[in-house]
Swiss-Prot record:
Principal location: cytoplasm
Tagged with keyword Magnesium: yes
Purpose of the protein: Transfers a GMP moiety from GTP to Mo-molybdopterin (Mo-MPT) cofactor (Moco or molybdenum cofactor) to form Mo-molybdopterin guanine dinucleotide (Mo-MGD) cofactor.
Annotated source species: Methylibium petroleiphilum (strain ATCC BAA-1232 / LMG 22953 / PM1)
Entry domain remark: The N-terminal domain determines nucleotide recognition and specific binding, while the C-terminal domain determines the specific binding to the target protein.
GO cellular component: cytoplasm
Protein name according to UniProt: Molybdenum cofactor guanylyltransferase
Alphabetical list of InterPro entries matching this protein: MobA-like_NTP_Trfase (IPR025877), Molybde_CF_guanTrfase (IPR013482), Nucleotide-diphossugar_trans (IPR029044)
GO biological process, one term: bis(molybdopterin guanine dinucleotide)molybdenum biosynthetic process
UniProt entry keywords in alphabetical sequence: Cytoplasm, GTP-binding, Magnesium, Metal-binding, Molybdenum cofactor biosynthesis, Nucleotide-binding, Transferase
Length: 203
């Protein structure tokens, strides 16, 4: 059994926020607190230690009380940059990533990913859930919700340094367990309008 104390949680807040007009998405208010802090508070009970991957307004993120690390890849590899930061900085055998813009992810997310990874002797485990853009019941991978063995660091460094940017192309090189979830907890806010709508739809 993979205990929570063996897992480092990483909140991914290093994106450019282009679909939100360039604002720092993780600092946008959701139910009165910043999105990234909401994600952090939801993640902390599920793991042993946490950190945030951010590239702007670092002092604001540091005020949340956990380590904040910017991307080490100057070419901006997207979410994989956050994966890389987590694997480089973690002192645990496992790392789990969650994006800052999906504030209502399940409170048993990490436990279910860990169970599947161990049961299938996989190198990583990720969420699979229906997407709002798909037909009802059509699940697809949600790769930013991912539990990884820390031993994958060398593989990811090679992939990113070779110009790789797509998560699915990297994960396809490894044994990956898919864990099915309902769609609702994974609704994310890509625009400010979607964020306001999410606030009114969730109780």
């Amino acid at each position: 059994m993979i205990g929570a104390e063996h897992i480092t949680g990483v909140v991914l807040a290093g994106g450019r926020g282009s679909r939100m007009g360039g604002v720092d998405k993780g600092l946008q208010p959701y139910r009165g607190i910043p999105l990234a802090l909401h994600a952090l508070m939801r993640l902390q009970p599920q793991v042993g230690t946490t950190m945030i991957n951010a590239n702007r307004n670092l002092a604001a993120y540091e005020s949340f009380g956990v380590p904040v690390w910017p991307d080490t890849d100057p070419d901006f590899a997207g979410p994989l940059s956050g994966f890389l930061v987590g694997l480089e900085r973690a002192e645990t055998p496992f790392v789990v990533t969650v994006p800052c813009d999906t504030p209502d992810f399940p409170d048993d997310l990490v436990a279910r990913l860990a169970h599947a990874l161990e049961a299938e002797d996989a190198e990583l485990a990720m969420v699979r859930a229906p997407d709002s853009a798909d037909a009802p019941g059509a699940p697809r991978p949600q790769p930013v919700f991912c539990l990884l063995r820390s031993t994958l660091l060398e593989s990811l460094v090679r992939f990113v340094h070779a110009g790789g940017r797509k998560i699915d192309r990297w994960t396809a090189q490894h044994r990956c367990a898919m864990v099915d979830f309902d769609a609702a907890p994974f609704f994310n806010a890509n625009t400010l309008d979607e964020l306001r709508r999410l606030e009114t739809q969730r109780v």
